[in-house]
Amino acid sequence: MANTRVSKQITAAGTVVLRENPDGQTEVLLVHRPRYQDWSLPKGKLDPDEYLVGCAARETREEAGVNVRLGIPLDPIQYPVSAGTKTVFYWRSRVVGNGRQKANGEVDDAAWFSVREALDLVTYADERPLIRQAVALPDSTPLLLIRHGKALPRSDWDGIDSERPLDERGRLQSQRLTPLLDAY
């Protein structure tokens, strides 16, 4: 009998979090997962109906206990997993705020390392080029252009067009924007 196993495409998102230490040197945030005994960049799978950028920020918060603002997108990586193929999309990012939250149970340590230490310590070779790429890129400020959500039909509204309310679909679109905007 032929192998009828279907290969699944798994999508995930993560970050390369950078900061400048008091000596002016760039540092990289890595997380340690005891289950895999690895040091890696924060990342994880998308929740249903989640934006990639929202996933990247959420996973970094959950695994490393820090809030980030995303910057320039980095090259995605792709690798085989038991269920099929996993593609992980990454963003260069920086920490916002100065508090650390408790990380989830998946990670037992999150720590800052010099670029050289991070390159030596990170377990997966395909994450090294991402660190190099993030460090080489300039700081940036994303510009997001957003058009309003779905509104009531003009024919059903007698007031000023700029005050025309969103319909049910538009309100849902607006709610879905929150994690997207929060990531930037």
Question: Where does each model-flagged region fall?
Answer:
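N-terminal strand-loop-strand
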Residues: 2-41, 143-149
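Short domain-boundary/entry signatures in modular proteins, especially
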Residues: 133-142
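A generic fold-level signal
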Residues: 8-10, 23, 83-85, 105, ...
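Active-site-proximal alpha-helix that buttresses catalytic centers in soluble enzyme cores
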Residues: 143-184
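Feature marks short, surface-exposed loop/turn motifs that line or immediately flank catalytic pockets
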Residues: 37, 77, 97, 150-153
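Unchanged
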Residues: 44-134
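Structural motif
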Residues: 28, 85-90, 142-143
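Conserved Nudix-box catalytic region and its N-terminal flanking loop in Nudix hydrolases
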Residues: 23-67, 155-172
